[in-house]
């Protein structure tokens, strides 16, 4: 596999060509979250929000689970928004936690099922450790409380924070993080995520496209960011997320140049969790994007 600087072998089409030949793809969104992970809306409600926004290609990319996608994939709303399979998988690169979005894979593929199960188990083990640590400082019943908040969602620290606030252990979820759950606090249990290479392989072997999510969020130096992108491509990654939520044009331009220089397609998404957190709504208007090779050129929408 070629390193950064050499163009990717797949035949791609520019955004300008897409706009010239079709008026269907105007608003897309390949990075969103529902109640199945840490979003605020039920999967069906999120699809309806996407439909109202005029989205024509859409992916529900919950953290380390495909449950939300599976629950709505055969609905009429899924057809209306051009729903494809999606997930945002956690992994590690060197000492940094990285997120990789997978799109348009077979959700029933053994490799994908095994990876989701592996990550779900890791989250459950971390939840148990968090609860044990909290009990050690007098906060009892945290695991049961967090699970009740999470219900069918992937359990995480926000669920503990919500339960602690509602139970009176703290005055707010913010206080829960400040005192117990934030970085360096008693409930900050580190995860041992699978390596980047294994997560990318699970996506690609399952027939999907692997996308490096929000590259600037990791706060890497320029040299380390280029090294990450190069390793991502060597592992089989195919696209770089150049926009997620609200980003200035200078960041979009920089990430576009990095993608082009490494022969990667570009992807975009709102990273929608709830209203006015990362962006006002689902959907990205492609008219604001610079010309280039975008991931939707290589996707086939499932009905």
Q: Where are each of the predicted segments found?
A:
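Active-site beta-strand/loop signature of hydrolases that rely on acidic residues for catalysis
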Residues: 58-64
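Flexible, glycine/proline-enriched loop segments at strand-loop-helix junctions
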Residues: 113-122, 148-150, 186-187
């Amino acid at each position: 596999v070629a390193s950064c600087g050499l163009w990717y072998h797949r035949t791609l089409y520019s955004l300008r060509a897409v706009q010239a030949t079709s008026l269907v793809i105007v608003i897309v969104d390949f990075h969103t979250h529902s109640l199945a992970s840490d979003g605020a809306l039920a999967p069906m409600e999120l699809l309806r929000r996407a439909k109202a926004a005029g989205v024509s290609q859409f992916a529900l990319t919950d953290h380390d689970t495909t449950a939300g996608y599976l629950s709505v994939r055969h609905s009429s709303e899924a057809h209306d928004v051009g729903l494809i399979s999606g997930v945002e998988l956690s992994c590690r690169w060197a000492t940094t936690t990285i997120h990789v979005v997978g799109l348009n894979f077979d959700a029933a593929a053994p490799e994908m099922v095994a990876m989701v199960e592996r990550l779900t188990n890791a989250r459950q083990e971390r939840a148990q450790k968090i609860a044990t640590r909290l009990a050690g400082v007098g906060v009892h019943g945290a695991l049961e409380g967090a699970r009740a908040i999470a219900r069918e969602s992937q359990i995480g620290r926000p669920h503990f924070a919500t339960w602690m606030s509602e139970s009176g252990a703290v005055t707010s979820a913010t206080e829960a993080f400040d005192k117990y759950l934030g970085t360096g606090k008693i409930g900050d249990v580190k995860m041992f995520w699978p390596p980047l290479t294994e997560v990318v392989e699970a996506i690609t072997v399952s027939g999907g496209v692997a996308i490096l999510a929000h590259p600037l969020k990791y706060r890497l130096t320029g040299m380390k960011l280029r090294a990450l992108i190069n390793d991502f491509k060597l592992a089989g990654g195919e696209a770089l997320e150049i926009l997620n939520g609200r980003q200035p044009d200078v960041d979009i331009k920089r990430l576009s140049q990095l993608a082009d220089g490494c022969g990667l397609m570009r992807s975009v998404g709102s990273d929608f969790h709830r209203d006015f957190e990362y962006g006002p709504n689902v959907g990205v208007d492609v008219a604001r994007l610079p010309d280039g090779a975008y991931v939707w050129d290589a996707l086939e929408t499932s009905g």
